[in-house]
Amino acid sequence: MAVNDYEPGSMVITHVQGGGRDIIQYIPARSSYGTPPFVPPGPSPYVGTGMQEYRKLRSTLDKSHSELKKNLKNETLKEVDELKSEAGLPGKAVSANDIRDEKSIVDALMDAKAKSLKAIEDRPANLYTASDFPQKSESMYQSQLLASRKFYGEFLDRHMSELAKAYSADIYKAQIAILKQTSQELENKARSLEAEAQRAAAEVEADYKARKANVEKKVQSELDQAGNALPQLTNPTPEQWLERATQLVTQAIANKKKLQTANNALIAKAPNALEKQKATYNADLLVDEIASLQARLDKLNAETARRKEIARQAAIRAANTYAMPANGSVVATAAGRGLIQVAQGAASLAQAISDAIAVLGRVLASAPSVMAVGFASLTYSSRTAEQWQDQTPDSVRYALGMDAAKLGLPPSVNLNAVAKASGTVDLPMRLTNEARGNTTTLSVVSTDGVSVPKAVPVRMAAYNATTGLYEVTVPSTTAEAPPLILTWTPASPPGNQNPSSTTPVVPKPVPVYEGATLTPVKATPETYPGVITLPEDLIIGFPADSGIKPIYVMFRDPRDVPGAATGKGQPVSGNWLGAASQGEGAPIPSQIADKLRGKTFKNWRDFREQFWIAVANDPELSKQFNPGSLAVMRDGGAPYVRESEQAGGRIKIEIHHKVRIADGGGVYNMGNLVAVTPKRHIEIHKGGK
């Protein structure tokens, strides 16, 4: 082969990410060189040309190597970025975990480069792979040419190939060094971020613990700020203060729950562990703050309920209180209202009673019998009545008090002893009343022990230092009705009270009720055949140091007054008493109302008994009761309720007046009546109904 027939190989720079191929390759132009030409003895004729070709190819190879080394760091890190992108890692690591993921990419690439380097270095050992080969290659090549006297082509291609491998190994080593440094930098950065995260987490935890220890203080401070932002109340009542405080706390809870919802969203979308921990701590603090506010709200609600119950009980007490002055005069008073006005003045009423007593005494002296002498008429003012009220005197609950001695109370009777024994004192005269049309006539009636009982119960009044009043409590005869309270306002405190006290109790004067009027009438005796229905009456004794004489009180509750049933009730179907535990209760069935309407009853107890007897005898309604309840109902008792609807000792169905009797509701108006369980009855009254 002629020298001019030689074709030099080509240089190839291969960019393979961690592959096993050489980064710089020399590709020979031919794979066979044939039979080398004859070389005569003497110096080799190929040395000069061979060295020229070597230097030419070596220059190209060195330049390629130099170019790669110059941009090697950028290209290597670019490989890292491409691998990160393929792995779905963020372009810029912001957390220690992100950095460690990036470090894993770098370490994997470094391992791949090391394997490629090892593939080069593990080839059969020969002269060309010596560590100093690039420096010695030219001299070695020249020596080979001089010694072999062969054609230079084969030697040249082998030298260029091995130089390419040596340079590739150098590139791999440089890349490994770059990657190793990068890996260490990433490790240091990750550790730094972890340390910073630990420090930040410790700060967050310390802040959380401090805030948790001051939850109550923070909650109160926020409530104070919210309260200060509202218009200030001037001399607020406890009820106003409670209402304001309840509004503030309720709004604060609503605000905290909104924050709670937003914070829960932060937990789900937290960008890193620290932010998630912050949100988690905030969630715990919000739970504590809401619990603190709820505890406040519970206390406020409990106090509000307590005050409402006190007010309700006070209202019930007031509605059932007969208030009178203890001045020895004759007075009439309406329950929960005040003194009933007298048409011609209080003195005229006292005179009318005196006249009636005198007339009755004269009549009895000449012809002993049961006689009654009217002394006043009671009329109800229709202008003060609402449409739903029974506009008759029967709806007025009133009491009349007078000196008991005028009705024949012996002065020698020890009332205190009689009262302690729950005893009675016989009186020759008592008071009674009778509804006649739209008026009620009050009369003095003689007693005979048969038609009109002589015995009058005795009670002792006790001084209430809190109210400054003398009081007597008269228990109700029905479980659902409250007791009656009789009070007297003394002209001055009793003897054992210090009138010069710096804080004396000054009772309020008894108000005047304008809804009814007592008009004195001329004393006219009438004979009473049969048995007279008497209202409740008592003889009230007072402590010796009170200076108050014994008082006879005749008081009337519409429940104790005879009356005719009115109203139509309502049609019912299915489980009638199923509604007794709900809403306003179960209405009076229309078929029962039809049976009772128009009938006159001695008192409320009589009506109730006849009502339940009628229900027990109804062929349809009676099917809803068990034999035990039916047996009780046939005797006039109410049916039993299930245990969950009972209240203390109240275990039977009760009848409730939708419009209170004290407010003019009809006692026997069946449109005003509903059947309720004891539990529901209490709930209705607590609601102010």
Swiss-Prot record:
Note, other: Pyocins contain N-terminal receptor-binding domain, translocation domain and C-terminal DNase domain.
InterPro entries per record: Colicin/pyocin_DNase_dom_sf, His-Me_finger_sf, HNH_nuc, Pyocin_killer, Pyosin/cloacin_T_dom, Pyosin/cloacin_T_dom_sf
GN (gene name): pys2
Protein name: Pyocin-S2
SUPFAM superfamilies tied to this protein: Cloacin translocation domain, His-Me finger endonucleases
Keywords, comma-separated and alphabetical: Antibiotic, Antimicrobial, Bacteriocin, Endonuclease, Hydrolase, Metal-binding, Nuclease, Zinc
Assembly information from the UniProt record: Purified pyocin S2 makes up a complex of the two (large and small) proteins. The large protein, but not the pyocin complex, shows in vitro DNase activity.
Molecular functions (GO terms): endonuclease activity; metal ion binding; signaling receptor binding
GO biological-process terms attached to the record: cytolysis; defense response to bacterium; killing of cells of another organism
Record Pfam families: Col-Pyo_DNase (PF21431), Pyocin_S (PF06958)
Sequence positions that bind Zn(2+): 656, 681, 685
EC nos: 3.1.-.-
Annotated family: Belongs to the colicin/pyosin nuclease family.
Known function: Causes breakdown of chromosomal DNA as well as complete inhibition of lipid synthesis in sensitive cells.
